[in-house]
Amino acid sequence: MKQSMVFSPTLREVPADAEIKSHQLLLRAGFMRQNASGIYSFLPFGLKVLHKVERIVREEMERAGAVELLMPAMQAAELWQESGRWYSYGSELMRMKDRNAREFALGATHEEVITDLVRDEVKSYKKLPLTLYQIQTKFRDEQRPRFGLLRGREFLMKDAYSFHATQESLDEVYDRLYKAYSNIFARCGLNFRAVIADSGAMGGKDTHEFMVLSDVGEDTIAYSDTSDYAANIEMAPVVATYTKSDEAEKELEKVATPDQKAIEEVSAFLNIEADKCIKSMVFKVDEKLVVVLVRGDHEVNDVKVKNVYGASVVELASHEEIKELLNCEVGSLGPIGVNGDIEIIADHAVASIVNGCSGANEEGFHYVNVNPERDFKVSQYTDLRFIQEGDQSPDGNGTILFARGIEVGHVFKLGTRYSEAMNATFLDENGKTQPLIMGCYGIGVSRTVAAIAEQFNDENGLVWPKAVAPFHVHVIPVNMKSDAQREMGENIYNSLQEQGYEVLLDDRAERAGVKFADADLFGLPVRVTVGKKADEGIVEVKVRATGESEEVKVEELQTYIANILK
């Protein structure tokens, strides 16, 4: 492709609203442009990268036995109502009405549509297992779109769905697609980890996220320093043991703590270590109010609270609900004197506290010398806190460290969550009606492009891995007015294309500095500069990733490039 014919508008300045490198560079290099908040156009170079990621995805999905189809972006509300997600999915689901006032949603995901499709066509175990996938635009009304392609309102996604007669069949396909995902991200050149995850609004169990390691990631990964254990911080269980001290219990005492609300403030004011304080929080669990206790130096993990109750929705109670329940403000909450109808659950660590402190459910007061079970009753002690760095790894090997990650893929064992809700059944080999067992597997295709750009860049621009680069080679005649340079550049361009390489020829009448700056910004793997030594049959070859350059004779160029790109 000749650069003079390409629509690739570059920017010299970093856009003010672009916070992270991938967003900045994809805009500056002319790979995309923003149309509205969280909505982008892919320009020609960006589209080439997107298509290469798509191709890798398709190859690995088909190798894993999945078959491609395409479903509609507009989905009837009746399907979402049938599954129970029309209201529970929340405000991220974009809803609309047609001219006849019939309700629809723009597809945020396609479990309902695929389940409806398959239930009408697959009636026997003889047609199972079945794995179908699509690459389709998705829509989510993000409250705060940010980070370019990483959190947008419209994005390209590959979603696959598998249907099974037995759990063993699901396990087999899940493992196969887990490996396919690992192959996809490895072929894209990414540094990633597969981690144990929460299924969230999707439902089901046994789920893994594929996380690209990056400081700008919105998720925290907890991983072992000596084993391959890795989990989303929301899902990492705490296996710590707590020993109760033999300190004698003291008499409960209420003390004034004016204007002291946060644990750190109360701890300092009372000269008590944070690990002897009891942090009390009120959660709304499927409309039921529950008091949750953790140690003062720990944080409540709301996903674990949700899992304790098998709840659909868990959220912090409002100030008004807390005021009505306990007649106090958030900073004074405590478990002592709570109405017996209100359930109190606590993290394991709370049971080991002796002579601790807690809120007194009275503004400006706390209790000291608080002892669980003597001063208040707990209905259940369980794992309710976030794991911390330095904790023992849940697999028993090593200690936990944290890293940030960008989620690019997610695989779920949905089980019968959707098939039972939507009456998607089949006849088993005994002629009995059974619900279809399902799996779900998603990859953020456009998000993967951003993740690659986030991992592969330097101070001068993008540095694309060869598997996804828009072109393999960038040929730059320095002076297009020179017949020797222009002709040699065109000859190299043509010969490399004949060898199967994708080549970009900078045939613009621009200054050398502009051409080189754009070349660095685009980040193609190999740059061939045709300069003053063209008359001698010599060019300069530069490897973008390493910055290494060498003069090469034209007759040796193809072999030299082949060795770089092998």
Swiss-Prot record:
Its main location: cytoplasm. InterPro entries: aa-tRNA-synt_IIb, aa-tRNA-synth_II, aa-tRNA-synth_II/BPL/LPL, Anticodon-bd, Anticodon-bd_dom_sf, Pro-tRNA-ligase_IIa, Pro-tRNA-synth_IIa_bac-type, Pro-tRNA-Synthase_IIa_type1. Its EC number is 6.1.1.15. It is found in: Cytoplasm. The keyword Cytoplasm applies. Keywords: Aminoacyl-tRNA synthetase, ATP-binding, Cytoplasm, Ligase, Nucleotide-binding, Protein biosynthesis. GO terms for molecular function: aminoacyl-tRNA deacylase activity; ATP binding; catalytic activity, acting on a protein; proline-tRNA ligase activity; transferase activity. GO terms for biological process: prolyl-tRNA aminoacylation. SUPFAM superfamilies: Class II aaRS ABD-related, Class II aaRS and biotin synthetases, YbaK/ProRS associated domain. Pfam families: HGTP_anticodon, tRNA-synt_2b, tRNA_edit. GO terms for cellular component: cytosol. It catalyses: tRNA(Pro) + L-proline + ATP = L-prolyl-tRNA(Pro) + AMP + diphosphate. Homodimer. Catalyzes the attachment of proline to tRNA(Pro) in a two-step reaction: proline is first activated by ATP to form Pro-AMP and then transferred to the acceptor end of tRNA(Pro). As ProRS can inadvertently accommodate and process non-cognate amino acids such as alanine and cysteine, to avoid such errors it has two additional distinct editing activities against alanine. One activity is designated as 'pretransfer' editing and involves the tRNA(Pro)-independent hydrolysis of activated Ala-AMP. Belongs to the class-II aminoacyl-tRNA synthetase family. ProS type 1 subfamily. Consists of three domains: the N-terminal catalytic domain, the editing domain and the C-terminal anticodon-binding domain. This is Proline--tRNA ligase 1. It comes from Bacillus thuringiensis subsp. konkukian (strain 97-27). The lineage of its organism: Bacteria, Bacillati, Bacillota, Bacilli, Bacillales.
